[in-house]
């Protein structure tokens, strides 16, 4: 695997750490590994990411709940804090926001226990993900929100290759244009595999495992 390098923005705490190579996810093969570990787990970076994302919802979106997938709970808490500050026009009648994450059962299906359902049912829900590429995880979360009676008001991510998911707008800080030659393929259509290039690592929302 090539050495990791950073793609920076004007904000020193908002960046992507990436490496080029041949990587496999559950749903696709890609030529980039995007590491957002520090953004998800370090407070200064999480706050910076949150500030970049919340301006999309500053004054025109009711948000009762932020549903976090891919381990984005710290960012979600920072977004909730920012959206309920006095300098924001908060359209939430209760002036507070729930921050939650799903429980996973067989096949990657998401569920919520009875004590958590009131945080979704009848609520305006923002979905927060580390990345939205194939969109399958985001779609599963949207299906779960709908099943439990919530209303999806948008999707936010650090990195996304799509601008909408199931008809909902996707707002991200980074997209494939920031990488230049980003590619993602279904496993059976991967040109690197067809060329005999070995997969270097398995990647998912938890990180990377070298092969």
Locate the predicted segments by residue:
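Short, glycine/charge-rich flexible loops or terminal/linker lids adjacent to PRPP-binding catalytic cores
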Residues: 73-126
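Active-site-facing substrate-recognition patch
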Residues: 1-62, 205-211
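Short, well-ordered alpha-helices that flank and scaffold nucleotide-derived cofactor binding pockets
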Residues: 55, 81, 85, 143, ...
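Short, well-ordered alpha-helical microsegments
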Residues: 73-77, 135, 163
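Short amphipathic alpha-helix with an adjacent loop that forms part of the alpha/beta core around
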Residues: 58-59, 114-119, 187
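A contiguous pocket-lining binding segment that forms or flanks enzyme active sites
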Residues: 111-157
